[in-house]
């Protein structure tokens, strides 16, 4: 029998500060299912394609069934994933202005098949519009496969951060270097750094009984923001300008403003991880007697997805509609 401390190093649990999987020998597994669903939604929803005949866009992730995991053994990473994905698409024929909808089905995305061999089926609801279906079958299929490739790349890099740990000697060197860096940071001016966390994307649309100009002003005029939010607001509606709403619970910065057409913002809630911002894009689309507001948001923490939906659907959309009704009554 080996003496204490002289056994096979593969089975010795060294005194590591993190206390996990020394020398990367032991089998560890991490469930990537929830993270993957959010990442697939982020990468697939919003994909757009256009040619001389029309324009199409993937509007919704209708179904994502399956699972994904990553395993670490002897310093190697092994990936397992199997997904059945259904997406909704919509499009407009340029010549006639006719609108059509359809589905995209990916019956088996798994490690057994190469991305270029992954089956992507496109269908369309009854009626004309085959020209849009052809656009989805060609350009659309290629873009979907490209997004699936980005998902696998992120699964193997972004998701696996920290699964392959350094050995004791390397870890000691890195720890010493990190301590020095931390000491330097304390002496230097603070720098706002973002954090990498699992995120999802959201796509919401809402119709408002008002003009594009009026709806745009509700998001850019301080007095109107204070009316629908029923709280003080800080608003600098210009590129690089800051904003703060709902008693400081929401804050951020304007990235781009195109009058009566588009607003892009860096956006965060107070209870999100420090220095983490989502990107929120609002597009104002005129419709007969109404305005359609299209909201696309990327970078929402997975654990805050439902809160984000509530914030926009209840605290923004419903309150703005209430303000518009009150304005119409007092007119």
From Swiss-Prot:
Offer one Pfam family short name for this entry. Aha1_N
Q: Mind telling me which InterPro entries this protein's record contains?
A: Aha1, AHSA1-like_N, ASHA1/2-like_C, START-like_dom_sf
The reply on keyword Nucleotidyltransferase is no
Is-annotated flag, keyword Chaperone? yes
Q: Mind listing the UniProt keywords for this protein, alphabetically? A: Chaperone, Stress response
Which Gene3D superfamilies does this chain map to? 3.30.530.20, Activator of Hsp90 ATPase Aha1, N-terminal domain
| Gene Ontology molecular-function annotations | ATPase activator activity; protein-folding chaperone binding
Q: Which SMART domains match?
A: Aha1_N
The protein's role, per its UniProt record: Co-chaperone that stimulates HSP90 ATPase activity.
Record-stated family = Belongs to the AHA1 family.
Give the protein name, as stated in the record.
Activator of 90 kDa heat shock protein ATPase homolog 2
């Amino acid at each position: 029998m080996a003496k204490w401390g002289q056994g096979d190093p593969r089975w010795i649990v060294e005194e590591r500060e993190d206390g996990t999987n020394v020398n990367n020998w032991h089998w560890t597994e991490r469930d990537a299912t929830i993270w993957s669903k959010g990442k697939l939604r982020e990468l697939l929803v919003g994909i757009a394609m256009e040619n001389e005949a029309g324009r199409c866009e993937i509007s919704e992730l209708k179904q994502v069934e399956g699972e994904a995991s990553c395993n670490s053994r002897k310093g190697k990473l092994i990936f397992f994933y199997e997904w059945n994905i259904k997406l909704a698409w919509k499009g407009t024929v340029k010549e006639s202005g006719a609108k059509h909808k359809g589905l995209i089905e990916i019956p088996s995305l798994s490690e057994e098949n190469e991305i270029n061999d992954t089956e992507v089926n496109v269908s369309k609801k009854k009626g004309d519009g085959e020209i849009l279906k052809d656009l989805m079958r060609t350009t659309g299929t290629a873009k979907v496969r490209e997004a699936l490739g980005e998902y696998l790349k992120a699964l193997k890099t972004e998701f696996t951060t920290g699964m392959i740990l350094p050995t004791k000697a390397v870890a000691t060197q890195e720890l010493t270097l990190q301590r020095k860096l931390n000491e330097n940071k304390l002496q230097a001016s603070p720098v706002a750094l973002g954090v990498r966390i699992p995120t999802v994307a959201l796509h919401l649309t809402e119709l408002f009984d008002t003009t594009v100009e009026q709806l745009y002003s509700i998001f850019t005029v301080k007095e109107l923001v204070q009316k629908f939010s029923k709280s003080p607001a800080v608003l600098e509606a210009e590129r690089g300008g800051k904003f703060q709403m709902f008693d400081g619970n929401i804050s951020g910065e304007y990235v781009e403003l195109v009058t009566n057409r588009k607003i892009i913002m860096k956006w965060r809630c107070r209870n999100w991880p420090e220095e983490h911002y989502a990107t929120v894009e609002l597009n104002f689309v005129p419709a007969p007697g109404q305005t359609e507001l299209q909201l696309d948001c990327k970078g929402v923490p997975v654990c805050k997805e439902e809160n984000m939906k509530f914030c926009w659907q209840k605290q923004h959309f419903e309150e703005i509609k209430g303000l518009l009704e009150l304005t119409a009554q007092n007119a």
